[in-house]
Amino acid sequence: MSNQEYTFQTEINQLLDLMIHSMYSNKEIFLRELISNASDALDKLNYLMLTDEKLKGLKITPSIHLSFDSQKKTLTIKDNGIGMDKNDLIEHLGTIAKSGTKSFLSALSGDKKKDSALIGQFGVGFYSAFMVAGKIVVQTKKVTSEQAYAWVSDGKGKFEINECIKDEQGTEITLFLKDEDANFASRWEIDSIVKKYSEHIPFPIFLTYTDTKMEGEGDHKKEVKEEKCEQINQASALWKMNKSELKDKDYKEFYKSFAHDNSEPLSYIHNKVEGSLEYTTLFYIPSVAPFDMFRVDYKSGVKLYVKRVFITDDDKELLPSYLRFIKGVIDSEDLPLNVSREILQQNKILANIRSASVKKILGEIEKLSKDNENYHKFYEPFGKVLKEGLYGDFENKEKLLELLRFYSKDKEKLISLKEYKENLKENQKSIYYLLGENLDLLKASPILEKYAQKGYDVLLLSDEIDAFVMPSVNEYDKMPFRDASHSESLKELGLEEINDEVKNQFKDLIKAFEENLKDEIKGVELSSHLTSAVALIGDEQNAMMANLMRQMGQNMPESKKTLELNPNHAILQKLLKCEDKEQMSAFIWLLYDGAKLLEKGALKDAKSFNERLNSVLLKAL
């Protein structure tokens, strides 16, 4: 059959160009990526052999074999895992799922060391081989298929797929190394890389090499070559080993291989439980957020094993979604080996493991929180996700509230709720918060003025998730939460009502505001909670809905709002005496525009605002 030629997805061409010309400061990681892929293929075959009736009689010894030819400058990585068919080759080696490449390319910083750390996270580990290889040949046969296929590419925009002969299922990747990277076709180089990155891959890795030794004596000495095959890794599932046998370095190197992440984890939790339930967990808190953390189709970072046999790496129920940044392993002794996805979702054993695991992880995060500098490294990438737990995890809500940090009116740095309570003023009855689109607008909000007079601090919440979760949080340490913009909260400040005399005094001015702004607002009210601000756009009824829609990525339909005026402000006192209708109209619009700026940070009609401002300035000069 003739070769079929295909073109790489556009983003892959960009990626390959990046890999080949400018990417890695540590090229050796390509081998870690290929070995990790081989291990995944073996895991998947093991699972199929448990669940697919047709494969239950299949007998294999799962392993990974490495070999090289220093003369021909080739390096081969071979596994007897699940293998691929033609469609798999096109999908996995011609495109990148989940738009990973686009996210990858946009995340690059230009710093080679930082950029190289991103490579495995974005599911592009295979392509890293083009950093050292001028050509790659992949021969593969899927376990459920009779036909084998070869994939060939030089990484320059195209690849070929053709039928080939291969007896055993699995995948064999041959790299034709570039001259400057021929050192990777070396026994000691390969051995060193495997021990560094893949020591605890749970399958044996064998290296085939030619050993040369001298035999005979004197003039009869001669060089004898012997081909040898040695296992070069421990092939022990690290999580099943005793903690006393492991060093910090062991955990960190395993993480890099397991999570495809060059950066070191912030922390790890290794736990073995014996008794009515027997299971082992090893969880890592990364230092870098997964690229797909805020995508609906995010990939779970936790693998489930039963008695060291891989079951799934795609079950989002293993941990709650607000802990989706966690990487690691759950290995149960009690679950049945042929457990199905449906059984997993309703399994009491797994529910107990999940509940205990969440408590362990939150306990570890609490330890990190004792050191502000360390906690900042955690909270900056993961704080927003952690907040999601307030909405669904009622069992751990109190613990989560302790772990959250907030900006506030009075503090420049993030504070805990405990710190907020420690600074409460006498007679303060609630924890006040204000929701908005960004921190700068919140800090400038006129709503804060009366709270400042009372000395009350206000939490400033600008994350999209805040509007979604705050209504579900009633109190912290027996103190209620209150939205600072709500009338209930303002009543707690003990503000005086606007008396009838003042209302009567401003009656005509309010009418003038309503006439000029009839297409913009639903009404005008005098407010007693403004101090230095002249006006404020208030919308207590719709504010929460607008924030919720923003959190869901939708825009709230434009609705008319109430304009609140400060009757004590000097500008309004002077406007009471203004008899020039045209000038008054310009002033009214400028005050409204100013209130809009404080609310939104921008104006819909900047041109008209500029014209009005120029007109007022001209008359004033």
Swiss-Prot record:
Primary location: cytoplasm
InterPro entries named among the record's database cross-references: HATPase_C_sf, Heat_shock_protein_90_CS, HSP90_C, Hsp90_fam, Hsp90_N, Ribosomal_Su5_D2-typ_SF
Keyword Cytoplasm: yes
Spans annotated as C: 548-621
Domain of life, per lineage: Bacteria
GO cellular component: a single term: cytoplasm
Record's keyword terms, sorted: ATP-binding, Chaperone, Cytoplasm, Nucleotide-binding, Stress response
GO MF: ATP binding; ATP hydrolysis activity; ATP-dependent protein folding chaperone; unfolded protein binding
Family: Belongs to the heat shock protein 90 family.
Subunit relationships: Homodimer.
Function: Molecular chaperone. Has ATPase activity.
Species name: Helicobacter acinonychis (strain Sheeba)
UniProt protein name: Chaperone protein HtpG
Region (A), start-end ranges: 1-341
Stretches for region B: 342-547
Span of the signal peptide: none
Keyword ATP-binding annotated: yes
PANTHER family: HEAT SHOCK PROTEIN 90 FAMILY MEMBER
Location(s) in or outside the cell: Cytoplasm
